């Protein structure tokens, strides 16, 4: 039997020689010992290191491009079956990386939106040309003689905050006047208090609790509250008080005035506001107060009639921008002593292209004025722009700007285009009259009106194509209950108050969600409940339907199946940067990057390039 070859051993051994102990030198050698690694394995390790460095460098470059900060070494956890990391840790690591990537996408979206807002924002402030040319700026608001009751002033700021919280009033600004919970504490005369009771108004609404003391204190203000919340009284009652004070100090002479000016986007809204002012002025006169005159200056009316009031000296004026500009340019009206300006439905006026007219009107003021802006829908873009005209403004918001009234039950139904007219008759049976029907086009208004008359329904119609006398008669007949149905375009959707209306029907979905909010706001007013029925079909723009879906969800209303199937991608992106939805139009179903209204505006601007009329005004176009 052959002797087996002795087993080869390494030079180092852990065994201690028998009968002796290891020396200190040998122990030191053991500590310095480095195990032998084969060449092949060393090459693989070197290659892995180089690959890791390359990946790390590429990741850092990518992070620098996206604007995010480079992450530390703790993120470079090797993944896969060869790593010494558990599957649970690997999963957590991947989840964190995905969330970080999502955060950077949101930051990128916000930066892009800021750039878009800057590009669409008006460069010039909403001030007169004269004020901008001379560099005139006002640092302090107008001072008034009104002060809150002493016991209200002695109350703590914590109490005021509790009141605001109770009534869901959001305020922004410095030195905000305290909220006051009764008209008597606001120091209104007994005649006005009796007039309010006659109208069934016993307590102020949330916008009135904070808004009226703010205006009586002389502060500039932006007032945002849902439709039917009593915004009109917020700016009409204070102007009556200011004019009464001026008349008592020094009576108005012939051709003097106005002291207070209220501008409205439509003739019907201006007429309604004028009626409210006349009602309270008449009550004051009956109570032995001086006569306060109020002029109505709107298109479609005789200028001679309007000038008759102005000649005697006028305290207040309610006007539409076009007619007011015409009277100012012809020097029939002077704003030399005007110190109070209220813009009702301000965002709609700026949006509808009246911004140039308003700027021109501002140039006729001779001194500082108290400026007030009111609306139910006021996107961030309009708010930022409007603030340029105000001095230390107070922003009062009751509910989200652009939110639908919670007193309106919204019903959305899918109806084919050809079936709309027949189904309209069915919808009219839901509630007793009066009923308001809205349509986008004038031709549709006329067609619906004709169809209802043929079916024996007592109906009237108004739109921009009808003359002023016909429009006025139609609204008066409907308001007095002589007619059961009013068919209208959006001319009747802004601010008009028909207290008895229980039902609004949208024959078609408006192109902008703001118009929808104004339309349905004609019902469910002053704490009453109303119904709004809206017809939708394939012809509706998907972006507006997404906004409608978001609005229904916000108001906790039933969402029909046809809207439930609509999705806008990553819905978490709709609520970033502290503001939900679009900053340009106020729609909740999209961001400004996908705003159809902005896109339409930009397309229009591009199409108008190169279309300037180079002919002189007096020349003939051959």
Curated annotation (Swiss-Prot):
Multifunctional protein that participates in many aspects of cellular RNA metabolism. Plays pivotal roles in innate immune sensing and hematopoietic homeostasis. Recognizes foreign or self-nucleic acids generated during microbial infection, thereby initiating anti-pathogen responses. Mechanistically, phosphorylation by BTK allows binding to dsDNA leading to interaction with STING1. Modulates the homeostasis of dsDNA through its ATP-dependent DNA-unwinding activity and ATP-independent strand-annealing activity. Transmembrane segments: none annotated. The modification Phosphotyrosine is found at residues 33, 414. Its EC number is 3.6.4.13. The lineage of its organism: Eukaryota, Metazoa, Chordata, Craniata, Vertebrata. One of its GO terms (molecular function) is RNA helicase activity. Residues 1-15 have a biased composition (Basic and acidic residues). InterPro entries: DEAD/DEAH_box_helicase_dom, DEADc_DDX41, Helicase_ATP-bd, Helicase_C-like, P-loop_NTPase, RNA_helicase_DEAD_Q_motif. Identified in the spliceosome C complex. Interacts with ERCC6. Interacts with FAM50A. Interacts with STING1. Interacts with CGAS. Interacts with several spliceosomes components such as PRP19 or CDC5L. Keywords: Acetylation, ATP-binding, Cytoplasm, Disease variant, Helicase, Hydrolase, Isopeptide bond, Metal-binding, mRNA processing, mRNA splicing, Nucleotide-binding, Nucleus, Phosphoprotein, RNA-binding, Spliceosome, Ubl conjugation, Zinc, Zinc-finger. Residues 407-567 form the Helicase C-terminal domain. Changing residue 364 to F: Strong loss of binding to dsDNA and STING1. Changing residue 414 to F: Strong loss of binding to dsDNA and STING1. The gene is DDX41. This is Probable ATP-dependent RNA helicase DDX41. A motif (DEAD box) lies at residues 344-347. ATP binds at residues 225-232. Residues 212-396 form the Helicase ATP-binding domain. The modification N6-acetyllysine is found at residue 9. GO terms for cellular component: catalytic step 2 spliceosome; cytosol; endoplasmic reticulum; membrane; nucleoplasm; nucleus; spliceosomal complex.
């Amino acid at each position: 039997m052959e002797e087996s070859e002795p087993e080869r051993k390494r030079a180092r051994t852990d065994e201690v020689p028998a009968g002796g102990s290891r020396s200190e030198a040998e122990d030191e050698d053991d500590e310095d010992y480095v195990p032998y690694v084969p060449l092949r394995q060393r090459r693989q390790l070197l290659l892995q290191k180089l690959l890791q460095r390359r990946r790390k460098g590429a990741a850092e470059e990518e992070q620098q491009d996206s604007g995010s900060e480079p992450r530390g070494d703790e993120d470079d956890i090797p993944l896969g079956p060869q790593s010494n990391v558990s599957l649970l840790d690997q999963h957590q690591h991947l989840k964190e990386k995905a969330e970080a990537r999502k955060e950077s996408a949101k930051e990128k979206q916000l930066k892009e939106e800021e750039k878009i807002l800057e590009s669409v924002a008006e460069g010039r402030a909403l001030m007169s040309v004269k004020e901008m040319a001379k560099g005139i700026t006002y640092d302090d608001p107008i001072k008034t003689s009104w002060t809150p009751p002493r016991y209200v002033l002695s109350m703590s700021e914590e109490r005021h905050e509790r009141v605001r919280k109770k009534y869901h009033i959001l305020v922004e600004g410095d030195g905000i006047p305290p909220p006051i919970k009764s008209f008597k504490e606001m120091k209104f005369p007994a005649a006005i208090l009796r007039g309010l009771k006659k109208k069934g108004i016993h307590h102020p609404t949330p916008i009135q609790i904070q808004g009226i003391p703010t205006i009586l204190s002389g502060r500039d203000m932006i007032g945002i509250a849902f439709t039917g919340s009593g915004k009109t009284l917020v700016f009409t009652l204070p102007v009556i008080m200011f004019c009464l004070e001026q008349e008592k100090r020094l009576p108005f002479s012939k051709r003097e005035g106005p002291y207070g000016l209220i501008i409205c986007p439509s003739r019907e809204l201006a007429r309604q506001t004028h009626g409210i002012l006349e009602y309270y002025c008449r009550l004051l006169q009956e109570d032995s107060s001086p006569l306060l005159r109020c002029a109505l200056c709107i298109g479609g009316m005789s200028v001679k009639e309007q000038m008759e009031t102005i000649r005697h000296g006028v305290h207040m004026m309610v006007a539409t921008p076009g007619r007011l500009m015409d009277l100012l340019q012809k020097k029939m009206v002077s704003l030399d002593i005007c110190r109070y300006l209220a813009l009702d439905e301000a965002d709609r006026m700026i949006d509808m292209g009246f911004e140039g007219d308003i700027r021109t009107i501002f140039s006729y003021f001779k001194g500082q004025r108290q400026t007030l802006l009111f609306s139910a829908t006021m996107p961030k873009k309009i708010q930022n722009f409007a603030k340029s005209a105000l001095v230390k403004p107070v922003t009062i918001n009751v509910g989200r700007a652009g939110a639908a009234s919670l007193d309106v039950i919204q019903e959305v139904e899918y109806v084919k285009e050809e079936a709309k007219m027949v189904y309209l008759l069915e919808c009219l049976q839901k509630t007793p009259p009066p009923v308001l029907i809205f349509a986008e086009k004038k031709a549709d208004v006329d067609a619906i009106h004709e169809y209802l008359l043929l079916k024996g329904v007592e109906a009237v119609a108004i739109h921009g194509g009808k003359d002023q006398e016909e429009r006025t008669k139609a609204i008066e007949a409907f308001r007095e209950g002589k007619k059961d149905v009013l068919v209208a375009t959006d001319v009747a959707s802004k601010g008009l108050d028909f207290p008895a209306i229980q039902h609004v029907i949208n024959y078609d979905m408006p192109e902008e969600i703001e118009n929808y909010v104004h339309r349905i706001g004609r019902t469910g007013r002053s704490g009453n409940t109303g119904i709004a029925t809206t017809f939708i079909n394939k012809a509706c723009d998907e972006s507006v339907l997404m906004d409608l879906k978001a609005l229904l969800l916000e108001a906790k209303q039933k969402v029909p199946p046809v809207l439930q199937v609509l999705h806008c991608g990553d819905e978490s992106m709709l609520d970033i940067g502290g503001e939900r939805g679009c900053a340009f139009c106020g729609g909740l179903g999209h961001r400004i990057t996908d705003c159809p209204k902005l896109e339409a505006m930009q397309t229009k601007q591009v199409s108008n390039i190169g279309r300037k009329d180079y002919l002189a005004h007096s020349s003939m176009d051959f």
